[in-house]
């Protein structure tokens, strides 16, 4: 059951450009807050994952595309940060993977299928560039995100185990 390929969306999704950086920063702050609520021991309440120069660098590199979802009024309502990975290990099959580094829909625009459209776009993009698979990380305590990705037919690939040593 491949849900993403069943529909063709006319998606208002484009590559991010430097003038999008203020909105990307705002969305990244929303992601950080979600992660902080799930794991306050690991994530700060506020801060920046990337500075503006790092965002410009990511935008300019072939293997780290950033896409934005822009509505009819030109307002950016979501983003998709990707990393194109190819294993360097001799023990691994040489497959290309599209890793979703970050996906966010603005908190004021949720429940409008924007996240689904971004995921569908990611899958189509991955297929177009010859990827074997699409992967992402999700925190186990982020139940809403887990359900969202399961609904889109993503399956667990591996589990990172943890034992907290400092209380």
Please place each PLM-identified region on the residue numbering.
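Conserved GNAT acetyl-CoA-binding A-motif
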Residues: 126-137
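Conserved GNAT-fold acetyl-CoA-binding loop/helix
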Residues: 32-55
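A short helix-loop-beta-strand connector motif used in the catalytic cores of GNAT acetyltransferases and
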Residues: 53-68, 99
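A short beta-loop-alpha structural element at the N-terminal edge
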Residues: 12-26, 35
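Conserved acetyl-CoA-binding loop-helix of GNAT-fold acetyltransferases
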Residues: 102-105, 111-124, 151
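Conserved beta-strand-loop-alpha-helix junction that forms the acyl-donor binding cleft
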Residues: 135-145, 162-166
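Conserved beta-strand in the GNAT
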Residues: 68, 75-84, 104
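Conserved active-site alpha-helix within GNAT-family acetyltransferase domains
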Residues: 116, 120, 128, 140-158
């Amino acid at each position: 059951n491949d849900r993403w390929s069943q529909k063709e969306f006319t998606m208002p999704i484009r590559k991010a450009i430097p003038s999008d950086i203020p909105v990307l920063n705002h969305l990244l702050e929303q992601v950080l807050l979600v992660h902080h609520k799930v794991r306050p021991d690991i994530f700060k309440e506020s801060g920046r994952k990337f500075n503006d120069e790092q965002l410009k660098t990511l935008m300019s590199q072939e293997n780290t595309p950033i896409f934005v979802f822009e509505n009819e009024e030109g307002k950016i309502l979501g983003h998709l940060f990707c990393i194109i990975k190819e294993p360097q290990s001799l023990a691994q099959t040489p497959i290309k993977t599209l890793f979703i580094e970050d996906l966010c829909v603005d908190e004021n625009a949720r429940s409008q299928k924007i996240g689904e459209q971004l995921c569908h776009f990611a899958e189509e993009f991955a297929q177009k560039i010859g990827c074997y698979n699409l992967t992402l990380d999700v925190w186990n305590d982020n139940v809403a995100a887990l359900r969202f990705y399961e609904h889109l037919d993503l399956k667990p690939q591996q589990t990172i185990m943890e034992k907290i040593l400092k209380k």
